[in-house]
A protein has these predicted regions:
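Metallocofactor- and cofactor-centric catalytic cores in central/energy metabolism, strongly enriched
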Residues: 1-152
Length: 152
């Protein structure tokens, strides 16, 4: 149970990182590496090492802080780049929205396996990086079903 909770925390941190990349021109190759590696680590049977997952969460936070360093000292925090609490997804009362967001998330995790292995082999596609970011943001946003479907 602890590992699953850490994986949820990592996923929430990745959604926060994705939020920080939207409209930001400072995202680097390292930013995308952290995002893809983090998503890959949340796949079933990839990592049961709690210490490694905690380190991945810290790496995601460092990457986010590099993109939006002013968020740490903001006098009027807006929460825009905060980590997402995945319990909001699991406890979503609308089962259709919960199911659609879960489908998006699990699909992203599966895609991350391919993207991770491509990354290890030296291949990268900026459009794929952006897609990961935009799709993670959708999981963390509160939309009615009709609007969520339009945004996919």
């Amino acid at each position: 149970a602890q590992t699953a909770q850490l994986q949820d925390e990592l996923t929430g941190a990745l959604i926060g990182l994705a939020r920080a990349t939207v409209g930001d021109t400072l995202a680097t190759e390292e930013t995308w590496n952290v995002m893809i590696t983090g998503l890959f680590a949340t796949l079933t049977n990839v990592s049961f090492d709690d210490a490694a997952i905690r380190e991945q969460i810290a790496a995601v936070h460092r990457a986010k802080d590099a993109l939006v360093p002013q968020c740490q000292s903001c006098g009027a925090p807006c929460g825009r780049n905060d980590d997402y609490d995945l319990r909001q997804l699991w406890e979503e009362p609308d089962e259709d929205i919960r199911s659609l967001k879960s489908l998006i998330l699990f699909g992203l995790r599966g895609m991350a396996a391919y993207a991770y292995h491509a990354m290890v082999l030296g291949y990268r596609d900026a459009a794929i990086d952006t897609f990961f970011s935009e799709a993670l943001c959708k999981v963390g946003e509160a939309f009615p079903m009709e609007e969520l479907l339009q945004r996919l």
